[in-house]
Amino acid sequence: MEKQKYYITTAIAYTSGKPHIGNTYEVVLADAIARYKRQQGYDVFFQTGTDEHGQKIELKAEEAGITPKEFVDNVSGEIKRIWDLMNTSYDKFIRTTDEDHEKQVKKIFKKMYAKSDIYKGHYEGMYCTPCESFFTESQLVDGKCPDCGRPCVPAKEEAYFFKMSKYADKLIDYINTHPDFIQPESRKNEMMNNFLLPGLQDLCVSRTSFKWGIPVDFDPKHVVYVWLDALTNYITGIGYDCDGESTEQFKKLWPADLHLIGKDIIRFHTIYWPIFLMSLDLPLPKQVFGHPWLLQGDGKMSKSKGNVIYADELVDFFGVDAVRYFVLHEMPFENDGVITWELMVERLNSELANTLGNLVNRTISMSNKYFGGVVENKGVTEPVDDDLKNFILSVPAKVNEKMDKLRVADAMTEVFTIFKRCNKYIDETMPWALAKDEEKKDRLATVLYNLVEGICIGATLLKSFMPETTERILAQLNAQDRELEDLKTFGLYPSGNKVTEKPEILFARLDLKEVMAKVAELHPPKAEEPAKEENEDVIDLEAKPEITFEDFGKLQFQVGKIIKCEEVKKSKKLLCSQVQIGSQVRQIVSGIKAHYSTEEMVGKKVMVVTNLKPAKLAGVLSEGMILCAEDADGNLSLMVPEKEMPAGAEIC
């Protein structure tokens, strides 16, 4: 029987610099899903790679004094090295500078032009170089890019445009009739309310102001817009040919089963990409999942903030599987996760060294101490054994359910319940006490057999997330690899097998102070900048004219509790909150959609200016202002009371 195919992709990494752990998280997440699908019996094809064209790269190469091709060769090689370091099992690593890809992009552009989906015109508006994105003045947030918060520059040039509106209704209908196409649900609502329903503008799909890109075949002074170039990797990488015979691989694999991408590029993958595919008369991918960000403790990772953590640095401290464990286990399904060195040490010591490592070590040590390493099922059972077996046998179905819903962190939590239950079983059965009674020797043997069998089942489920650890555990137990189907049965470990004589430490405990001292050596304060107290960032603002105490006293500040929050239709940046202030509830509109979801807002207590004259923003009445702070990268943070305060409390 032929295996069912499963085609999974990540967004291809932009080659502007070395990827940090937040970038690396995505490929590790995709790898865990791909590995699990293989365990389920699917014929998996996992594609990742690098996005290598664009103005930003041209400028970076110029700064480095090398050609753009030399620059991307270096960075792409570094990205691939890190993906390999993280033990990712991709089947293809595509580069957008690959000859086959560039050839097909030219043909795709030409086909779209021949269909009159692309036409020639002039572009005048704003352009964000880091995001390689065009915006109108009205789309900017305080004059900055609505996606990354950086300044945009005016752009005026001859360009080709794609008729996005031609396919808008068809895409809206597709999204409405395919509820799983965009996940999580909140991402779908954002795309519908902020982009599709208000109406799509035609998209600029070529540039003439720089040269580092794929030339338009019939008008070579133009280069293809980097997103049209990059998105097509999902089909060119598997052999698509728009005016010839596509490969058997393409016919087998397309449409993709899952595009796994960051939430910040969901628009490109759920609006631009589906419309491009419609233009090519190709089916749409089955699902696009916009995962949350992995943040440093003080916000989104940024080189300008100096808070970047790199995967290879983490691996040097903790090992590959410990890093995989952390990024997979700590990332929620929808909201952003946090990574810090301190949290990594805590998780390694508590979960990996104690819960898992200590369990394996104790079990092997007791097997050697009491039975010379031989593990036998003597069949002397008690009710506690059935409790253990029933619990362990219930876990694989739970893991399967979570993985099918892409709730990878929840799936890992389920796996670790097996190891925690085995530790509890040791406390319940007390093998050391059984060993003191010769008449209970067979009971002791049964207990140790149950522990070994439980660990084997847990290790099999762990394989997709921490493959090296699974291999090391099974090797020490002298156990064979199992299929997921085998996990419906408890007792497959061969009775009479012998475990290793000297158990290997899976995860050594770390001393936090020692780790932080080494981190400080790794990332010393820059010589030209004095070390800031408590690692706090500072921003110097241009001073505004002084005001009197009387003027300041006219403003009223109170604590408000957000009891409801909704997105403002036809706005890309506004949220509308219902805020309880004393016995009143006020409606306040805030430009913080890029920084907080509606779910995150509800329940928060915030600082509010309550005596501003009501005004309409995007046609919605606003009766106050919620206060935020903004850092140098444009990230906003709500100002909240340090201690618990009642709604309505005066801020003085």
Annotate the PLM regions.
Residues 1-48, 100-104, 148, 154-369, ...:
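Structured secondary-structure scaffolds
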Residues 2-75, 94-109, 114, 131, ...:
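N-terminal catalytic cores of NTP/NDP-binding nucleotidyl/phosphoryl-transfer enzymes
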Residues 76-91:
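A glycine-rich helix N-cap at a beta->alpha junction
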Residues 115-168, 172:
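Cys/His-rich short segments
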Residues 120, 343-380, 391-499, 609:
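Helix-rich, typically C-terminal accessory recognition domains appended to large enzymatic cores
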Residues 287-290, 474-476, 576:
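Beta-strand segments within the central parallel beta-sheet cores of soluble alpha/beta enzyme folds
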Residues 470-551:
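Intrinsic disorder at enzyme termini
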Residues 531-652:
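Phosphate-backbone binding interfaces of nucleic-acid-interacting proteins
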